[in-house]
Amino acid sequence: VGFKAGVKDYKLTYYTPDYETKDTDILAAFRVTPQPGVPPEEAGAAVAAESSTGTWTTVWTDGLTSLDRYKGRCYHIESVAGEENQYIAYVAYPLDLFEEGSVTNMFTSIVGNVFGFKALRALRLEDLRIPPAYCKTFQGPPHGIQVERDKLNKYGRPLLGCTIKPKLGLSAKNYGRAVYECLRGGLDFTKDDENVNSQPFMRWRDRFLFCAEAIYKAQDETGEIKGHYLNATAGTCEEMIKRAVFARELGVPIIMHDYLTGGFTANTSLAHYCRDNGLLLHIHRAMHAVIDRQKNHGIHFRVLAKALRMSGGDHIHSGTVVGKLEGERDITLGFVDLLRDDYIEKDRARGIYFSQDWVSLPGVLPVASGGIHVWHMPALTEIFGDDSVLQFGGGTLGHPWGNAPGAVANRVALEACVQARNEGRDLAREGNEIIRRAGKWSPELAAACEVWKEIKFEF
């Protein structure tokens, strides 16, 4: 037999500190917490091995391939400041390990097996560098930011949305009525909640019809283009595409998908359909916190956001920095830039471990949603800038006078903030004053200001 049987240390093969990374490599930064007694080099090498070519023992079929050409390599390890026994392990994967245009295959390879590994107490994928050669195998977002603005004819400000509540239990006609009132009041979009699919109290086809009616009625009355994110997520891909086809036949501008529960394969198929048929695609990240909330185990959301840009979506929820859900400001802004910009420099302060060049893949609009109201408007305008969607669910429907006045209040607040910013005023310092002054001319906004109290915001 021409090979030496038996178990050998991973680090002998997979820890290569002298390796020069190639432009075509996919690079990963893992936060590794080894079990007591396991050296960090062995833990990092184990991750590289188990997520590429390795298995636990030497096998004779290793001799039939060129391991050097195909193996993942742990090329650098650094300890995490302020954390005991935590390391960042950098791993380089040769491009040939991955199927072109498949986020599913990329994740199956990189995170598929290694997270249950005994030598590790915990493991978190913090960032990925997707090389241009691999980016180019993806279609990416169906349309992107510029095309969306042109389709909607809306420029120079963030877009406004609202999730229809209560999310479950309304009949289709009442649901459509709520949509109409919000759009009529001045919002650009309304939204199906992520778990509104096709339940007994409201089947999808009825909802699509009544929402389309609401959209057209509001468009006629306001002279603006309106949309409602019709959730096409379904139990099978075929059913999902059937719903997308019906939305296209109704002539509505945008549909929606839950990309993590629906899965990357379904999402990429839907994104291709949307580009071919002129539909915008709104993406909800339901289930993300299961994967990304633990600080030392799982996958950071910036990786899920990059994966979505590759798989395809025109909007994605990205946290608010100011509302009811968790999100640290610099880190959030880091992945907001990763969604929108063509080229992003490495910036460890914002959690960006690698420079990322998207080579002409269209951008994705970040959606701020969750516990926000009119007093947050100056902060949101300042933090997210024009290329974003600000979504006020309770902050619209919770208005004491109803949905349409709630929508008016949000639109007036937004226009006031954009105007103040364009005049060179400091939204951080004068935010509350700007909202108060706008409220003098808008009873709807004044009423909203009463219900939700001013916030102290430092930014």
From Swiss-Prot:
The basic functional RuBisCO is composed of a large chain homodimer in a 'head-to-tail' conformation. In form I RuBisCO this homodimer is arranged in a barrel-like tetramer with the small subunits forming a tetrameric 'cap' on each end of the 'barrel'. Binds 1 Mg(2+) ion per subunit. GO terms for biological process: photorespiration; reductive pentose-phosphate cycle. It comes from the Eukaryota. GO terms for cellular component: chloroplast. Its EC number is 4.1.1.39. The active site is at 165 (proton acceptor), 284 (proton acceptor). GO terms for molecular function: magnesium ion binding; monooxygenase activity; ribulose-bisphosphate carboxylase activity. The modification N6-carboxylysine is found at residue 191. Heterohexadecamer of 8 large chains and 8 small chains; disulfide-linked. The disulfide link is formed within the large subunit homodimers. This is Ribulose bisphosphate carboxylase large chain. The disulfide bond which can form in the large chain dimeric partners within the hexadecamer appears to be associated with oxidative stress and protein turnover. The gene is rbcL. Mg(2+) binds at residues 191, 193-194. The keyword Oxidoreductase applies. Keywords: Calvin cycle, Carbon dioxide fixation, Chloroplast, Disulfide bond, Lyase, Magnesium, Metal-binding, Methylation, Monooxygenase, Oxidoreductase, Photorespiration, Photosynthesis, Plastid. Substrate binds at residues 113, 163, 167, 285, 317, 369.
